[in-house]
Amino acid sequence: MKELFLEIGTEEIPAGFIPKAMADMEALLAKELENARISFDDIRTLGTPRRLALTVKGLPTVQPDAEITAMGPARNVAFDAEGKPTRAAEGFARGQGVDVASLTLVATEKGEYVAAVRKESGRPVPELLAEILPRLVANIPFRKSMRWGALDVRFARPIHWIVALFDGVVVPFTFGNIESGTISRGHRFMANQPFPVRDFAHYLEECERHFVIPDPERRQEIIRREIHRVAKAAGGHLLPDEGLLEEVSFLCEYPSAVHGTFSAEFLKVPREVLITSMRSHQRYFSIVDDAGKLMPGFITINNTLTEDPTVVVKGNERVLRARLSDARFFFEEDQKVKLETRVESLKNVVYQQKLGTSFEKMERFRALAEGLADLLNPAVKVKVSQAAFLCKADLVSGMVGEFPEVQGIMGREYALIEGEDAEVAAAIAEHYLPTQAGGELPASDIGAFVSMADKLDTICGCFGVGLIPTGSADPYALRRSALGIINIILDKGYRLSLEEQVDKALGLLAAKLTRPAVDVKADVLEFFRGRFVNLMADRHASDAVDAAVAAGCADLVDAAARIAALSEFRSHPDFEPLAVAFKRVGNIVKEGVDAPVDTALFQDAAEGLLNDAVQGVAVSVREKIATGAYLEALTEIAALRGPVDTFFDKVMVMAEDERVRTNRLALLTGIARMLGAIADFAKIAA
């Protein structure tokens, strides 16, 4: 079996483009090979700012032969009344390169059609790769791509060389004005000269010799080891940041870490501002002491080795000093204007053209947050109102204008400096949480209520003016907001009706809506339902989720409890036959029968047996459902399996006598409604 190696050498590709490009290369090539009937063992991709590469192991030298069936016209079109081929059949056969006499008939759902079966001899794999690889290079998707020179091709950055080898032999093709070959290049600054490549193993060896580490995982490990070493040498510990670690690994080809310092005077600026300035603007790692306090130092990753890093360090320190000086200036200037005064300035900030100013938005979600406090924790209502009033004030501060990432954090810091209540100050920062899937949630009810209210106003407002997420676009991060609300509700165990909260939000937005409120409400609730189902399906079997949600999900905590109970109930030894029996009950009664069961109408002992069993568990099951003890309720309902099976074996439910039929349906309705309070068993795969 043979090996394919491909390297695309470029000018510096943005770090954020590279991981996705590597994944896309693998997926695109796998699809191309599959379509070409070329088997392989595995594909491995590599990437640096100046090169994207891949290798494929276990390739054959020749594509396997294939028997291809092509469908032609319908039988009555291909043959006349006497069974002779028509011109349509002759033309089809000619187009397929077969004799008309070799055409066969194939039965389909639409009737009989003629078909041509032809054998296709396998082609040499290198010949096929010469067609596949230029398509692969052309089809790698980037957020932004560019043309260069007068060429009619696009890529993330201009391509300077291409290495393409099959079993050590060049796979010849051209992309733009670049012909594939065997020549790669080393590090731009440390070994910027060409070198030949024989195969993938040789490529890795030569890259190392030319100061390039093409494997991003290996670069990350080197960086991780280096930054921990440097932090320890500086007398501290690294502040972990896996996101930054991944990013800087795609900013270099041969990483080395150096330590720099800044004046301890800057530590008077809030910690988050310093970290943000170093991380987001300079890609520096922060250092903390044994107590977790920020130290006046940083670690930066170079793309080169230097015998004397002093010059590099001084340059980095100079740039950071300017950044931190700006931050200190804004921090000091912002304190001259109180947050309450800044709230008035929100009247001049447009939140969204159709939804009004940030001040209007604040008034809306402040009312929602106060309502949540009334419902869930009245003792904190005053603090909730104050936190909601102040939580957007820092948007018009100089610091947030310069460092948008610290919105909320600066509001908290300024509130504390002004002597605001500590819980209110904390909630100002917490109301932005969670900022990402699986992220930190608000710790306090105050922060949770303001966070939920702000996000619900955003969702209802955007849906209300037609700004609804699509499969590819969600500019207002509505999916993240909905998941944030759901996770807060589940984490805190808040028992509330989501439908009622949506009604309140839409009522506050009434003057802004451009769509009927009833339509907006339906869309918003379905949006939440979809996010909730997806979240639960990550933790439980999808059919259990669908079954429980079908029984209602206005109260998310209750729905989650029913899902968990149903998932655990799957371990019951009789689960599958129980599910089948319960499905049958549900299918027969459909809407149910609102009539008391009359034992005088029983005609078979099985009816009495089932009625006694139902009456024996009904009260206990209702009590358990009322208290949310769903697993215990299901376990008790499971005792009905035997009587239900006997009932169906011996009793004709749909009796001719209407009174008997109705009575039997009423008996089954009692079971169906006990089950229906927990889940719709018709959704269970059994």
From Swiss-Prot:
Which InterPro entries did the record assign?
Answer: Gly-tRNA-synth_bsu, Gly-tRNA-synth_heterodimer
Q: Report the catalytic activity.
A: tRNA(Gly) + glycine + ATP = glycyl-tRNA(Gly) + AMP + diphosphate
- Which GO molecular function terms does the record list? ATP binding; glycine-tRNA ligase activity
Q: What is its EC number?
A: 6.1.1.14
Q: From the UniProt record, give one GO term of the biological process aspect.
A: glycyl-tRNA aminoacylation
Location(s), subcellular: Cytoplasm
EC class: ligase
State the GO CC annotations: cytosol
Record Pfam families:
tRNA_synt_2f
What are the record keywords, sorted? Aminoacyl-tRNA synthetase, ATP-binding, Cytoplasm, Ligase, Nucleotide-binding, Protein biosynthesis
What's the domain of life for this entry?
Answer: Bacteria
Subunit record text = Tetramer of two alpha and two beta subunits.
Entry similarity comment:
Belongs to the class-II aminoacyl-tRNA synthetase family.
Name of the protein this chain belongs to:
Glycine--tRNA ligase beta subunit
Species of provenance: Geobacter metallireducens (strain ATCC 53774 / DSM 7210 / GS-15)
